[in-house]
Amino acid sequence: LLEFEHIIQVNDLGNEAITVLTREQLWRGLALRAQEPDKFNQGLSCSYKSLSENEFLRTISTGESSFYERVVLTPEVKIHTETTGDSQQISAESTAEIEEPELNSLFVRFTYKRELGDNNSEINIGEHLKSAYVQIDQDAIAMIRVLAESNLFDQAIN
């Protein structure tokens, strides 16, 4: 079992060269990533079915593999994702939670828990996954920043 978390600083209030994102902008970006992860990772295709205003089931396909997940949104706070149903897929869950220790000082805490499978190879799969998660999350925050600075959220959604 891999259990891992990391934090990304979104706003550096001491660096005037970086635009300060609002909590709403950050939330819009994180929610967009949850609903349409294929806009953040071109190797994916995604479809989803709404269960309620803040909950949906999504299917993410990459190559010949598909993953089925339940996603629960707590608006402007966190997004929780958990695999569902199919016994052929690994059990996994993740959370992206906005933290604001002081006004406009935004961070996102990413938490992951997943099975690693029975692969006993010499490669440390857990360390590779941790590195991949950090890179993907950093790229997502960078993309959210570009969308916010360029006022492109509405175009990205369509």
Residue ranges and their predicted role:
Residues 8, 45-48, 67-73, 91-100:
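Hydrophobic/aromatic beta-strand elements that line small-molecule binding cavities or substrate pockets
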Residues 86-138:
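Beta-strand/loop substructures that line and gate deep hydrophobic ligand-binding cavities in soluble
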Residues 10-12, 64, 112-116:
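Beta-strand elements of well-folded, non-transmembrane domains
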Residues 46-47, 145-158:
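Short, highly charged C-terminal tails/helix-capping segments
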